[in-house]
Amino acid sequence: MPLTLTLNKISKTYDDELILSGLSYTFNEGGTHILMGSNGCGKSTLLRICALLEQPDAGNLVFSASGKGELPQDLSLRRRITLVLPKVGVFNGTVFNNVAYGLKIRGIAKDEKTERVGKMLKFTGLENKRTQNALTLSSGEAQRLGIGRALVIEPDLLLLDEPTVSIDNKNRELIETMILQMKETGRTTIIMTTHDNSQAERLSKKLILMKNGRISLS
């Protein structure tokens, strides 16, 4: 079930530098929201806070779902949220095992795990590489693997931090197609950062401009 996330006056400081300054915004469930802004405006910091990997210095986050109201910020909620970084980390093992990692630690049964990973490898265009060592993938293929690893656990909130930066056009187009297909299902709330204005317009009408640690336009 997709999540709605409301940010209430979020502030964050690093080494006496104010990164986020009283930021408030609501990301509605099932939408694809694109965060834009210059380097250092706080986009990546905001995603880490949304992923519950960091705490704000001030303000609070409210997660909710239709028919369930506000949700407690516990381990159960954390497992419904995934963050994909600009450069995905892969481990020494097959592409299949890399994608299956999140299902394994959640104790998903073998048959279900095999089925879900198989579908995700097809979705990400990595079906013919399932037995290949993930360390041998190109940067673009590794990025697709990372998104597949995030999606296979069926998250309710997917956070994508510059998912197509520094990869070739072919893999960028494949990842954009994946995001558009996810968007059509409405089953996952997506928040993504990008510097590419054209890409932002291709992926969503919900464009959010950050400046000086705040939302300046949406």
What is the meaning of each model-derived region?
Residues 36-38:
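The feature captures the beta-strand-to-loop junction immediately N-terminal to the Walker
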Residues 51:
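Helix-to-loop junction immediately C-terminal to a conserved catalytic motif
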Residues 158-161:
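Catalytic Walker B motif of ABC-type/P-loop ATPase nucleotide-binding domains
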Residues 154:
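Conserved catalytic motifs of ABC-family nucleotide-binding domains
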Residues 133-137, 141:
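Conserved ABC ATPase signature
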Residues 68-82:
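ABC ATPase NBD coupling module
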Residues 111-129:
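Conserved ABC ATPase "signature" region
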